[in-house]
């Protein structure tokens, strides 16, 4: 496992990951991998190499575009911590609130606090998000549902940093969201993986 992590080290750095935080990233991935058989945090059929190439690098693709000077962030549907834990490791000065309704996954995320002490773990997304400056998510819900979950935050000018896949699907989601949120302003940025031929986009609201 360590071999593939070291093999991808240049890619992590190329994408903008903090070299000093690589030991924490490795510790998180080892914990995620060792816990997966019991908790099913990611597909049990997935190899460690696929975990890095399909998930970790996926999360890092837009990391250079993460809003500057953010002090408090939230991640919706955090699951096994992709991207929430990775971003908390990358940005240790950001108080990162992870929202995950599964009790088992919450328990796992609480174990990650020893690796990234700036993490705060919660269950359901509350009606009002206090002090949050940006919301992240990956492979969670459609755009309109994410906005519905955080309607009060959105109305107050909240920012969203959403990792999505196919452009066609994104266009459908945005069209539906615009029916509910007439003033919705969206920017869709293509992302290019250096290790896989996959269609990825960053949705900024």
From Swiss-Prot:
Gene Ontology MF terms: rRNA (guanine-N7-)-methyltransferase activity
Cellular component terms (Gene Ontology): cytosol
Superkingdom of the source species: Bacteria
Keywords: Cytoplasm, Methyltransferase, rRNA processing, S-adenosyl-L-methionine, Transferase
Main location: cytoplasm
Xref: Gene3D superfamilies: Vaccinia Virus protein VP39
InterPro entries: rRNA_ssu_MeTfrase_G (IPR003682), SAM-dependent_MTases_sf (IPR029063)
PANTHER family found in the cross-reference section: S-ADENOSYL-L-METHIONINE-DEPENDENT METHYLTRANSFERASES SUPERFAMILY PROTEIN
The family this protein is said to belong to: Belongs to the methyltransferase superfamily. RNA methyltransferase RsmG family.
Protein's name according to its UniProt entry: Ribosomal RNA small subunit methyltransferase G 1
The species this protein was found in: Bdellovibrio bacteriovorus (strain ATCC 15356 / DSM 50701 / NCIMB 9529 / HD100)
